[in-house]
Every structure is written in C-alpha cells, then in structure tokens.
Amino acid sequence: IDLLSQSYWNNSVLRAIEGSVEPFYDDAQAFNALDPASPEFWDLADQYFDMDWYVDYIIAESWMANTDWPGNNIRIYRSDKTNYRWRFCLLDMELGLLPNGWTDCYFDHINHMLGQDPNNPYINVWLKGMQNPRFRNYFINRFADLMNTSYKIERISAIEQSMFNQTVLEMPREYSRWGDPNNVAQQMTDFVNRHHEFQFQLSERTGQVRNHIQADLGLNGQVEVTIDAFPAGAGTIKISTVTPDARPWTGVYFDGNPVVITATPNPGYAFVYWDANSIFTSPDFNASIELNIPTDE
C-alpha cells in the first residue's frame, strides 16, 4: 500500500506514511498529459485515479463548504484492492459550515473550486475533468443524485440529531472536568445553541448548492423529476446512479445536463414503453433513454 498525507502541520509537503510519494507524482504527471477533449479521457484517467470515488470525494468536500482544503487535510492511498488507482479520503471537515466553520450554508464552494490553482494535483483532476463532457455530465448528475438521497435534508438532519442526542447527556461531565466547572449551565446552553445552528445550516445547504451549480456551471434551471412503474412491482427504474427502493420517487435535476433513465423488468414482466409527456409526445419504446429534462415531469 502507498498511504500519503499532506497537512499544514508538516509544512504542506506530501509525505509517505506507508510506501512512497513518487508513484503519485508519476501518475499525476501522466494524468496532466491527457487531453480532456478526448472521448477516452474518463477511461484513461480512471487508470490513475478511481474516478467514481474521486467525484464522490469532491462532492462531499463541496457540499460541506470545506475551505481548509485542497491545500490541507490531504490523505491519499492506493493498493491492490484499488487496482493501484488513487483514492482520496475525507478528514478534518470541522471547518465547513457554521457554527464552527470558516464558511456557512450560503458559501459558493463550486466557485471556490473553479478558482483553485491547477498546479495543485488534488483539485486539478476536477478542474481538468470539468473540461470533459462525460466527466462534467457525471459530476453534475452525481451531485444531484446525492442531494436527492444521501444528502437529503431529512436524512442529514436525523443523523446530526441522533449524534446530538447521544452526546448531550455526557456534556455536563465533560464541561465539569475539561471546561469551566463553575459555569456548566452556560456551556450547556451554548452547546444546545450550536446544535440548533448546525441543524439550520444543514437544512439550508442543499438548496444553496443547487443554485450555485446552476449559476456557476451555466445550467438553465432545476427540475423535479418523478418516476414510477406500472403495475406496482413490475420492475426497477434507475435514474443516473440512483435506483429508488420505493416509487413514485421524485428528485431534483438540472435542465441543460442530460440524464439517463433505465427501466429493468422483474422476472415475469417485460418493459413496454415510457408514457408520453411534455418531453416526448408519443410513447418511447427504448428501455434506456438519455434526455434533457427542461420542465418538472
């Protein structure tokens, strides 16, 4: 395994925890030689960096509005388990979003990334990738997918609330020993207030990020897409990278960035057609379709 780290605490120099840094620099140099206009760009880049993994990593950093990165808090690894492709790790995200962060839920992190130095190899994969149509399309749709699922407001808020519920019971003892033992009540009040502020930040973030993606990447708008299958239990429908467990299912995507929708029938059923709507005025008999969605459907 090659396990690498870069932080301000080590003079912002990439160093090897295990293995060597030279293979990373060799692969970064080879990546830089790729032509983003080539239709083979993604497949070639994927030989050096796990591209699916990398996109999810970038999305996480961006959704959390983390600006203590990409010059700091870098952790990279590769091994035989990754087919010797580099993967980036999330760490030290505490400076993203209020109440403790350098940014808040309104911060335009997409614009922040667009302004980064392409000589930084950790963000250059994204900067160069965004010049490639396949990468750009995937990044936008994958960001939409995650905001419709993993980063859905109800889910994120419930996770934070659960962590708060577990922690709050221990905090009086924490403050009594490690804080100000003469002012535990005020410290508890501050702790609860920070929880409420963080809940607000989480609840507002996705809406703001969608606006930033639309504005900064020149998209036409945001659309609600609803998918369903008839009869119930007849099969599954995959939109972009998401296969919802329950239907009807609604997610928000972007007008100006085509999305692939695929129907897969269960045993004993057959796909017949997509029903006509405002996008195609007659039924479509292809099980997999790629289309731009300009209005709510």
Listing of model-derived features with the role each one plays in the protein:
Residues 223-231, 235-239:
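A short, amphipathic beta-strand motif
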Residues 175, 179, 258-284:
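Surface-exposed interfaces of beta-sheet-rich extracellular modules
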Residues 240-270:
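Extracellular modular ligand-binding repeats in secreted and cell-surface proteins
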Residues 1-19:
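Conserved ATP-binding subdomain of kinase catalytic cores across diverse folds
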